[in-house]
From Swiss-Prot:
Keyword S-adenosyl-L-methionine: no
One Pfam family per UniProt: LRR_At5g56370
Keywords for this protein: Leucine-rich repeat, Repeat
InterPro entries, per database record: F-box-like_dom_sf, F-box_AtFBL13-like, F-box_dom, FBD, FBL60-like, LRR_dom_sf, LRR_FXL15/At3g58940/PEG3-like
UniProt protein name: F-box/LRR-repeat protein At2g29930
Ranges of residues in domain F-box: 11-63
Record CDD domains: F-box_AtFBL13-like (cd22160)
Organism: Arabidopsis thaliana
Keyword match Cell membrane: no
UniProt repeat feature LRR, residue ranges: 66-90, 140-164, 166-192, 216-243, 292-323, 324-349
Length: 459
């Protein structure tokens, strides 16, 4: 079949697009750069008025020019009905009154989405910090609220999503008044690290409306000493929580369906061999209604060290956890026994530390357990009572220990229907056709299986 060369000529096809399309295209660029297109031709001169997103970053060009550019842009778009999102990223220290005037303009114009980020400390006046139209708000870095937030005041009656990244508050009460001032808030994202020096998040989230909560909290040692955690969120459906173990938990999470936990034990306490600190018992009771639970390897260790009584997870259908060669599986048998309706078990890597307390969920046997094996070999394996139908293993490298653990699973999980194994090797690592991947998969396929319905797949 012959091909015809299509002569596109020198026609400017982009300029011939409808205004609405060009406005969408310009909205994808930083506004500083998008404004440069106005010099291309008369066709492009006024297209900036059609953008629906203002993305302003003073890292480009002259600092004074940037401030003047923001003033001119906001004035130019004073009557625009298309702009819905405003993003301001200040790499330099700008005049606080000028920045506040920009933010006030955004609130007055009825924008739907506001993103504020700065590398320096910038004060936000609380007297005008309110909007009836804002749906999404993100505050990052050095922006902080100055003044008092009156309790009971509604600041953002329509706000659905709030993200606070290293945002500092005068005190805990001010933070809670801010959250309470968002009565229909559905999604809250909190990110704090130990670089924060001033008062920040203190472990409290209380809201009747929040449905999704993401927390990454890495407190300084000073703040950790008095660390307590309170989640009073009865409508919460999804929780992603990463922090050090707290001294105490008070939770109301009756609607929770999925939890992703990365709870860590302070390294300085481990290094100093101090007494066990922290208690996750009430936290686990509070999330015992979940259907899906994801655990980091650190969480396994904390559950083992800091939980007095493990609750029964009657609704748990999917359990996922990560392994680490320096952390044992001591708590895994207890988790499996306390999950009577578990259907899917997901494990990221089978390599873990061999201990005397991994129980019969593990095929690894320490020297001490070998001596006691004869007296315990008749004990019922916790895997044999599991209702698990789907087993997902990732990071599988085919070592002798891993193969032994795979055998242990296949021989004891009686209800298995599907096993998905993610092999972590290159398909061909050697010359002369020696396929290591094939040898690993063949070894797994040759393992005996208790369930005749069990099918093994590789990815």
């Amino acid at each position: 079949m012959s091909t015809k060369r299509v002569d596109m000529g020198s026609r400017d096809y982009i300029s011939s697009l409808p205004d609405e399309i060009l406005g969408k295209i310009l909205s994808l660029f930083c506004t500083n750069r998008a404004a440069c297109t106005s010099v291309l031709s008369k066709r492009w001169r006024n297209l900036l008025e059609l953008v629906d997103n203002l993305d302003l970053n003073d890292a480009y060009g002259n600092h004074q020019y940037f401030c003047d550019f923001v003033d001119r842009t906001l004035a130019l778009l004073s009557n625009s009905t298309t702009v819905k999102r405003f993003s301001l990223n200040c790499a330099f220290h700008n005049d606080a009154s000028r920045v506040n005037s920009w933010i006030r303009t955004v609130f007055d114009r009825g924008f739907l989405d506001l993103h504020l980020e700065t590398a320096h400390m910038h004060r936000i006046d609380t007297e005008f910090f309110t909007s009836n139209t804002l749906l999404e708000l993100t505050i990052c870095g050095g922006f902080y609220a100055e003044g008092r937030l009156p309790p009971g005041r509604v600041f953002f009656p329509a706000l659905k999503s709030l993200s606070l990244v290293s945002v500092e508050f005068t005190d805990t009460l001010m933070y809670q008044n801010f959250i309470s001032g968002c009565p229909v808030l559905e999604e809250l994202f909190l990110h704090y690290d130990n670089e924060t020096q001033c008062p920040a998040w203190k472990g409290l989230v209380s809201s009747p409306s929040i449905k999704r909560l993401n927390i990454y909290d890495n407190p300084s040692e000073l703040r950790y000493e008095a660390y307590k955690c309170c989640f009073q969120i009865p409508s919460l459906v999804y929780l992603d929580y990463s922090s050090y173990v707290a001294k105490q938990y008070a939770v109301d999470l009756v609607s929770l369906e999925e939890a992703r936990l990365n709870i860590r034990y302070p390294e300085r306490l481990v290094d100093q061999n101090e007494d066990i600190f922290g208690d996750v018992t009430d936290l686990l009771k509070g999330i015992s209604n979940v259907k899906t639970l994801h655990l980091s390897s650190d969480s396994l260790e904390v559950f083992h060290l800091c939980c007095d009584t493990m609750p029964v997870f009657h609704n748990l259908l999917t359990l996922s956890f990560e392994s680490d060669e320096e952390i044992g599986w001591q708590v895994v048998p207890l988790l499996l026994n306390k999950s009577p309706n578990l259907e899917t078990l997901v494990i990221k890597s089978l390599v873990h530390q061999v201990t005397d307390m991994c129980g019969n969920a593990c095929a690894c046997i320490s020297k001490r357990r070998k001596k006691k094996k004869k007296t315990t070999e008749d004990d019922e394996c916790c895997l044999s009572t599991c209702q698990v139908k789907v087993l997902n293993i990732s990071g599988y490298r085919g070592t002798c220990k891993e193969l032994k653990q795979m055998r242990h699973f296949l021989e004891n999980l009686k209800c298995l229907e599907t096993v998905n194994v993610g092999v972590d090797v290159k398909r061909r690592e050697y010359k002369n056709g020696n396929n290591k991947y094939q040898r690993i998969t063949n070894a797994v396929m040759e393992l005996p299986r208790f369930s005749s319905n069990c099918q093994i797949q590789f990815f």
